[in-house]
Amino acid sequence: MTNPNRKTILTAFILTGTIIIILSIAQSFKSFDRSQVVVHQILDTIYYIKSYKLPENVTFADEKMPLDNFDTRESLEREILTSAYRHSSTILIIMRAHRYLPVIEKILKKNNVPDDFKYLAAAESEYSNMVSPAGATGFWQIMPETGREEGMEINNVVDERYNVEKSTQFACDYFLKSFEKYGNWTLAAASYNGGRGAVDEQIDIQHQNNYYDLLLSEETARYIFRAVAYKLVITDPEYYGFKIAKEDLFPEFKFYEVKVDSLVTDFSNFAEKFGTNYKMLKLLNPWLRKPYLTPKTNKQYLIKIPSEGMRSTENTEAENRSFEEEKSR
């Protein structure tokens, strides 16, 4: 074949291919669904990473945070961003708060401890019976030796660190003693995390007695800011990107209590007598560490029994409707 013929065939081939490509593109434009662009534009508008403007005034236990100081401001911003973008963990904290904060609030009020201290439990344990690698346990992360020193029963059968009411009372006693020592609630709260000894040492070394002016261990330095970040997110979740339906919040446990001061050999049988099961009994009484109880001499235990219908989601939905109606009045 001569070179001119080859060039002619090659040119024809290229032209044919170009025409096919142009026709294909034209066809794709005809069938193009513009709604897909709209959907992507909407999604891009809804979700994007951003920073959050701090409120003009932020307090912890009615004590003002010095947000005019850049280091204070940046520390709070760090914890807010951490909370806002730890999606699943923070959602669970908000959902648990609906169940447990009423319990904690009542005990704080009874002891004249500021209401903001309830957010320390979120910083400590995310409102769960967490166990740290060091052995700190429960909502308030109490070490075994510290709990025993304050009269808590802690053994392989009963561990009162898992009891929300008793551990919150323990925390209140600590807060009050620390407040008496330091004269302000912010340092009292910080000492719960770092220990009074460590806080005292840094006060002596640095000649400062203001939490925001002290250089403390990283965990204690972040502690108050973390609690305040949870306070902001829990009280206004939608602003921080958490849209949670009321019915998705964990309901409060409904129960009544029975007094026990004698041996219980089998909590499964015990539960059946009250129309429930061991699983529900343990859910309400996580401080019972064994399926039996050998009580201490002259000690009475209050065991929670689920009220009728506590487990039903229908009751939860009805309660949420009542809450919304009350809220709208």
Predicted region positions:
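An acidic, Gly/Ser/Thr/Pro-rich helix-cap/linker signature
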Residues: 2-112
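Primarily a LysM-type cell-wall glycan-binding module
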Residues: 246-275, 328-329
